[in-house]
Swiss-Prot record:
UniProt source species: Dickeya dadantii (strain 3937) (Erwinia chrysanthemi (strain 3937))
InterPro entries attached to this UniProt entry: PDZ_sf, T2SS_GspC_N, T2SS_protein-GspC
Residues on Periplasmic side: 36-272
Cellular compartment(s): Cell inner membrane
Stretches of the chain found on the membrane's Cytoplasmic side: 1-16
Principal cellular location given in the protein's record: membrane
Chain segments annotated as transmembrane: 17-35
Family statement: Belongs to the GSP C family.
Record Pfam families: T2SSC
Name of this chain's protein: Type II secretion system protein C
Keyword Transmembrane on entry: yes
Highest taxon above the source species: Bacteria
GO cellular component, as recorded: plasma membrane; type II protein secretion system complex
């Protein structure tokens, strides 16, 4: 078996190879020198820390979705406008609204609600008697209730329908008219007077039956400070006064006019 040998390299080829190797080493050293000259001695060396990418979005949970819409708490009852108020359905609860002290500030307004011949005074965000429902707004002639996820309106003497207790509709209407004619709200309207977030009394103005209002000596915008001896400037006493109004047919109002106080006696009821 013949093995061919490579011809020996000539001296000129060897010199050329050595020259290229030396030039390569020289260029490498020269590059390192220029790199060190160009870089400042105190230049901070930046370090890069690679961390796993974090999700930009919050994880989706089942609580983010609602099957039947948003509850009234999230919609805020205070956001109800006049058009929504007029379109609310009447309440189906077995309650009657027998009196209202309503003003611009809902937190100072009081509603008198009757259930099973008992009177209860309630304010905004307070639960009505006998039901897991609360008052979200008090108006001069109605209150707005939040019950089982929806809003309902409880109007003055509007909850007794013709089918209750088996009483014929005509008889119920007659009873309602007689009862409505003896409510204080028909003669006097109350609205809170606030000063520095303190209740000063209630502004009086005539109700639908204004003749009786003026006949007893009351004047527009009189300020009532007491009702039947109960101080209307005290929230608890004011509630008690409102509760008793539905059971009496006469009362004494203490009004403050031009810095002077005077008691005005008023009797209502019957066909007056």
């Amino acid at each position: 078996m013949n093995i061919s040998k490579l011809p020996p390299l000539s001296p000129s080829v060897i010199r050329r190879i050595l020259f290229y190797l030396l030039m390569l080493l020289f260029c490498q050293q020269l590059a390192m020198i220029f790199w060190r000259i160009g870089l400042p001695d105190n230049a901070p060396v930046s370090s890069v820390q690679i961390t796993p990418a974090q999700a930009r979005q919050q994880p989706v949970t089942l609580n983010d979705f609602t099957l039947f819409g948003v509850s009234p708490e999230k919609n805020k009852a205070g956001a109800l406008d006049a058009s929504q108020m007029s379109n609310l359905p009447p309440s189906t609860l077995n309650l009657s609204l027998t009196g209202v002290m309503a003003g611009d500030d809902d937190s100072r307004s009081i509603a008198i609600i009757s259930k099973d011949n008992e009177q209860f005074s309630r304010g905004v965000n307070e639960e009505v008697p006998g039901y897991n429902a609360k008052i979200v707004s008090i108006r001069p002639d109605r209150v707005v209730l939040q019950y089982q996820g929806r809003y309902e309106v409880l109007g003055l003497y509007s909850q007794e329908d013709s089918g209750s207790d088996g009483v014929p509709g005509a008889q119920v209407n007659e009873q309602l008219q007689q009862r409505a004619s003896t409510t204080m709200s028909d003669y006097v309207s109350f609205s809170p007077i606030m000063n520095d977030n303190k209740l000063q009394g209630y502004r009086l103005n005539p109700g639908p039956k204004s003749d009786s209002f003026y006949r007893v000596g009351l004047q527009d915008n009189d300020m009532a400070v007491a009702l039947n001896g109960l101080d209307l400037r005290d929230a608890e006493q004011a509630k008690k006064a409102m509760e008793r109004m539905a059971d009496v047919h006469n009362f004494t109002l203490t009004v403050e006019r031009d810095g002077q106080r005077q008691d005005i006696y008023m009797e209502f009821g019957g066909d007056e």
